Amino acid sequence: MASLRRRVRAIALQILFELDATDHSPDQVVARRLEEERLPPEGERFLRRLVFGAWEHASYLDRIIEETAPNWPVSQMPGVDKAILRIALFEALIDEEEKTPLKAIINEAVELAKQYGSDNSSRFVNGVLGTVVSRYRERRKG
């Protein structure tokens, strides 16, 4: 299951990156990627929840990112880093269905940053998420 969840997070990252860079419809992009990826039902549900949840709450999540990293405006942040942070923060602060442990959320985000981001992405993502978790811990038990 862990490898499926990592794969789904990587697909969600790619979808959010595309949505942020284009005017494509979230429904159409998700449908296209699901057709390409052929995920099992639990993977499909997880993907939909991550993408639509992070996209729907993007403004709120971006405010949290900017409060945490004021020297890095979200509008100037690399798209990969922004998408990874939105996914992880959605999972950590908003998603009530999964209850993924905070440590696992941060670890998965750092791994995505190592794989898809720049040389500094993993440190940046880890720093932002570590700070957010300590500030917002009361919003979610875990």
Swiss-Prot record:
Gene Ontology, cellular component aspect: cytosol
GO molecular function, one term: RNA binding
Pfam family, one: NusB
GO BP field: DNA-templated transcription termination; transcription antitermination
Keyword flag Zinc-finger: no
SUPFAM superfamilies xref list: NusB-like
Keyword RNA-binding: yes
Alphabetical keyword list: RNA-binding, Transcription, Transcription antitermination, Transcription regulation
Family: Belongs to the NusB family.
Function: Involved in transcription antitermination. Required for transcription of ribosomal RNA (rRNA) genes. Binds specifically to the boxA antiterminator sequence of the ribosomal RNA (rrn) operons.
Protein name stated in the entry: Transcription antitermination protein NusB
Annotated organism of origin: Roseiflexus sp. (strain RS-1)
Taxonomic lineage of the native organism: Bacteria, Bacillati, Chloroflexota, Chloroflexia, Chloroflexales
Gene name of this polypeptide: nusB
